[in-house]
C-alpha cells in the first residue's frame, strides 16, 4: 500500500509565506505595467533593445513597482480588512506581520533602486523612485483619503512606466515618451471610476471619498464618458507627431470607439454589473493599445 504524502509543516509555511509576499506585489498590475515599460523601450530605438538595459531595467522597475504595491498593502491594511474586494489580503488576514511586510517592501525597493542606478542609469532609478513615492505616499497615504480627485492627481505616478522604459535605454527624457504618459494618465480615471461605481458602498463604508461616493453614480458615469472622448484624442497624439503610423491609427481608433461605446452603455443603459464590465474592458484596451503601438513600430517605423 502506498504511503500517504506528508508535507512538512515548515515547507507548507514557507510556501504560504512566499505566496503572501508575492501577492503583496500585485503581480497582475505589475505585469500590465511592464508591458508598457517594454513598449517604451522598443519605441525609443529604431532597432533591437540592448540586453543589459532590457533585463536589468525590467527587473529593477518591476521590483520597485512591487515595493510600491507592498507599501500600498501596508498603508491600506485597515480599510482592506473592511472591504469585500480586499479583506482576504495577507495583512488583514494576519498571514504576515506588519514588520515583515515593511521589511519586504523596503528591501525590494532598495534592491530595485540599486539595480537601476548601477546597471541601467541614475535617471531611470530616480524617476522610478519618484513614481514609488507618488503612488505609495502621495496617492495611497494622502490623496486617496483627501479628495475625490485622488485618481486624477495620483494617476501620474501610475502613468510613468513607458517613460521609465524609454529612459532606461536612452538615458534621456523625450517628448514622445511623454505622449505615452499622457495616454495612461488620461486612461486612469475612467478605468478606476468604473471600479469605484461597482464598489461604491464599500468605499463609503471606509470613508474613502471616491467620486461616486461624493458626487453620485450618474455624475461619475458622465465623467467616465467624457474621459473616454478625451482618451481617444490622447491616443491620436503619437500619429499627429509622426511617432506612429497607419497600423496604430486604425488599431487605436477601433479600441477608442470600443471604450466610448462601453462608457455610453454605462451612462445610458441600466444593466447590472455593467460598471465592472467597463473596468475589465479598460484593462484590455490599454494592453492592446500598447501591443498595437509595438506592432506599428516594427511594421511601419
From Swiss-Prot:
Pathway: Porphyrin-containing compound metabolism; heme O biosynthesis; heme O from protoheme: step 1/1. Keywords: Cell inner membrane, Cell membrane, Heme biosynthesis, Membrane, Transferase, Transmembrane, Transmembrane helix. GO terms for cellular component: plasma membrane. InterPro entries: Protohaem_IX_farnesylTrfase (IPR006369), UbiA_prenyltransferase (IPR000537), UbiA_prenylTrfase_CS (IPR030470), UbiA_sf (IPR044878). It is an enzyme of class 2 (transferase). It catalyses: heme b + (2E,6E)-farnesyl diphosphate + H2O = Fe(II)-heme o + diphosphate. It is a multi-pass membrane protein. The chain crosses the membrane at residues 29-49, 51-71, 101-121, 123-143, 150-170, 177-197, 223-243, 244-264, 281-301. GO terms for biological process: heme O biosynthetic process. One of its GO terms (molecular function) is protoheme IX farnesyltransferase activity. Its main location: membrane. Its EC number is 2.5.1.141. It is found in: Cell inner membrane. It holds the Pfam family UbiA. Carbon 2 of the heme B porphyrin ring is defined according to the Fischer nomenclature. Converts heme B (protoheme IX) to heme O by substitution of the vinyl group on carbon 2 of heme B porphyrin ring with a hydroxyethyl farnesyl side group. PANTHER family: 4-HYDROXYBENZOATE SOLANESYLTRANSFERASE, PROTOHEME IX FARNESYLTRANSFERASE, MITOCHONDRIAL. Belongs to the UbiA prenyltransferase family. Protoheme IX farnesyltransferase subfamily. This is Protoheme IX farnesyltransferase. It comes from Shewanella denitrificans (strain OS217 / ATCC BAA-1090 / DSM 15013).
Amino acid at each position: 500500500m502506498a504511503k500517504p504524502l506528508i508535507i512538512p509543516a515548515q515547507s507548507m509555511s514557507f510556501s504560504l509565506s512566499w505566496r503572501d509576499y508575492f501577492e503583496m506585489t500585485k503581480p497582475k498590475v505589475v505585469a500590465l505595467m511592464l508591458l508598457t515599460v517594454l513598449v517604451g523601450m522598443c519605441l525609443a530605438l529604431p532597432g533591437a533593445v540592448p540586453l543589459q538595459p532590457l533585463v536589468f531595467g525590467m527587473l529593477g522597475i518591476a521590483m520597485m513597482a512591487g515595493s510600491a504595491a507592498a507599501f500600498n498593502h501596508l498603508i491600506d491594511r485597515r480599510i482592506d480588512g473592511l472591504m469585500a474586494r480586499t479583506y482576504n489580503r495577507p495583512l488583514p488576514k494576519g498571514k504576515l506581520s506588519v514588520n515583515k511586510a515593511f521589511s519586504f517592501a523596503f528591501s525590494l525597493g532598495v534592491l530595485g533602486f540599486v539595480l537601476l542606478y548601477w546597471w541601467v542609469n541614475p535617471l531611470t532609478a530616480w524617476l522610478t523612485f519618484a513614481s514609488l513615492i507618488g503612488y505609495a505616499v502621495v496617492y495611497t497615504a494622502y490623496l486617496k483619503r483627501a479628495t475625490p480627485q485622488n485618481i486624477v492627481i495620483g494617476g501620474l505616478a501610475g502613468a510613468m512606466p513607458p517613460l521609465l522604459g524609454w529612459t532606461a535605454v536612452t538615458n534621456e527624457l523625450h517628448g514622445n515618451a511623454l505622449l505615452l504618459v499622457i495616454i495612461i494618465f488620461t486612461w486612469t480615471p475612467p478605468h478606476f471610476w468604473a471600479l469605484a461605481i461597482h464598489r461604491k458602498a464599500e468605499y463609503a463604508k471606509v470613508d474613502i471619498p471616491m467620486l461616486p461616493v461624493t458626487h453620485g453614480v450618474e455624475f461619475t458615469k458622465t465623467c467616465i464618458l467624457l474621459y473616454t472622448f478625451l482618451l481617444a484624442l490622447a491616443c491620436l497624439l503619437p500619429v499627429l507627431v509622426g511617432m506612429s503610423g497607419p497600423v496604430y491609427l486604425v488599431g487605436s481608433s477601433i479600441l477608442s470607439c470600443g471604450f466610448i461605446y462601453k462608457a455610453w452603455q454605462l451612462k445610458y443603459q441600466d444593466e447590472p454589473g455593467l460598471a465592472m464590465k467597463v473596468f475589465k474592458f479598460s484593462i484590455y484596451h490599454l494592453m492592446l493599445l500598447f501591443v498595437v503601438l509595438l506592432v506599428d513600430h516594427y511594421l511601419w517605423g
